[in-house]
Amino acid sequence: MSFFDHLQKKGVGAIQAQKVQIRKVERKPSKVVSSSSSSSIAKPQRRLDTVSKPVAARRSASSASKPARHPQPRSRPPSRKRNTIEPTLFGSSEESDTDVSLDLRITKRARVSSSVEPDLHRRVRDTDAFSDGEAAFDMIHAADIISSKKSLGFNNAFGIEDGPIIVELQYPGAPQKERYQLVVPRDNDGFKPLDDIVQVLEIVSQNYISEEHLALFEDESNGLLRRLRRALSNTSLTDFLDGVKSYNETIQRLHQDGSISRHLDSKHALALPLVERILTQVYSRTVSPRVDSLRQYENGSDNVYGELLPRLVSKIFAETRLKSDQVFVDLGSGVGNVVLQAALEIGCESWGCEMMQNACDLAELQEKEFKTRCRLWGLQPGQTHLKRGDFLEVDSVGKILQKADVVLINNQAFTPELNHKLVNYFLDMKEGCQIVSLKSFVPAGHRIQSRNLNSPINLLSVKQKQYWSDSVSWTNAAGTYFIATKDSSRLKAFLESST
């Protein structure tokens, strides 16, 4: 969903300090990263804990081709088709629909860090996910996505004719595994199970494995990553299954001996690629299969769909210094992407309100799967609250705005009337509350004067910020956003100087 890994095509590059400058907007192809993992293997009708009869994958004679959203209830510009955060590892061509090809470059792990300031009060690990008594829970498996589409548009990976093969993938948190079908989409924009497996292993290596065990994953001769890359390069199903089995056993051992728990307990923040991977998994299992329902919007109204992509959202969190003991509110939360990102990346109490019913339905699906995914990854997010209705009329929203520390309003296409009504809500917000918007609520050149003393905008101190290209869903271009802080000191100073 880059919704939210640094491999997504939109909105996930490394966050850079923004300078006031003219920058040529260029579109760059997403980087190709290869890594993979999986678990117990089974035939279509049953799963096996071990591979009793290795299946030799046939190599094709032909060459293979190389391989979060944030809707807003009120007005949003029409969005471009959302790009999922899946790296382009596998694909199909007219010449070969079943073979697999990928970039096998070996890269040393770059230690990833959070884009926000460390919050020493935050504890990122979900202790329940690591308890022995963790019960089974409902989840949407990757295999369910394929099944829901009745396998249309997919070919079996590795050239297998009698399949598809099903594998199970172990996560670093709760012991429950996820089922995957080893298939390749005919449409390059379709769901890519192999890519998802690869990214899980890559993210686990980067964020859950301590230095003392790193060689198990990244040894250039026989590390788990290398073994899987070699298996994919050689189109060897047997080697791939063996590599996945070894990965699952390694994760289970590190989970049981406490290594993963200790590593997570040393952290006070989550890296953006990890956040994006989880949000992408949630989005691809809930929103993507139903995304057509979001295309219903009315131009010129307050109900237009559009998203702020994870990179920009993370930058906003950093700019506002949002912390885990604070309250975040998204007015016009769409399918809940930003609400979930705040709860996961920051760990804060996170609220959203949306009036478009289709978006609300999908937001509730995302929220449920989000909690499941956090358990699988062993992470403790902040509380999430999603409300239906007009945020100007929902009582609970008005009350939470009085406690809010950061409020996001994607008012890019709001009508002037709605923007004017919103300004009056700022009167009830607490001192120091920060309001982030794509259009400023304070006109350029505004000055406090005797004739406008009663205007709510006199309570706002505004800063203009820049975002780079591919930060929002409706355009590739760079742009600006605004952070308004409720600060009554300027108005008090004016009144004192006038007496």
UniProtKB/Swiss-Prot annotation:
EC number in record: 2.1.1.360
UniProt-annotated stretches for the region Disordered: 1-96
EC category name: transferase
Primary localization class, coarse: nucleus
Listed Low complexity bias regions: 51-66
GO biological process, one term: DNA repair
Domain DOT1 span(s) in chain numbering: 178-499
Catalytic activity: L-lysyl(79)-[histone H3] + 3 S-adenosyl-L-methionine = N(6),N(6),N(6)-trimethyl-L-lysyl(79)-[histone H3] + 3 S-adenosyl-L-homocysteine + 3 H(+)
Database matches in InterPro entries: Dot1, DOT1_dom, H3-K79_meTrfase, SAM-dependent_MTases_sf
Regulation of activity: Ubiquitination of histone H2B to form H2BK123ub1 is required for efficient DOT1 methyltransferase activity on histone H3.
Binding-site list for S-adenosyl-L-methionine: 305-308, 328-337, 354, 390-391
Transmembrane segments: none
Entry-linked Pfam families: DOT1
A GO MF term: histone H3K79 trimethyltransferase activity
Further comment found in the protein's record: In contrast to other lysine histone methyltransferases, it does not contain a SET domain, suggesting the existence of another mechanism for methylation of lysine residues of histones.
Name assigned to this protein: Histone-lysine N-methyltransferase, H3 lysine-79 specific
The species this protein was found in: Coccidioides immitis (strain RS)
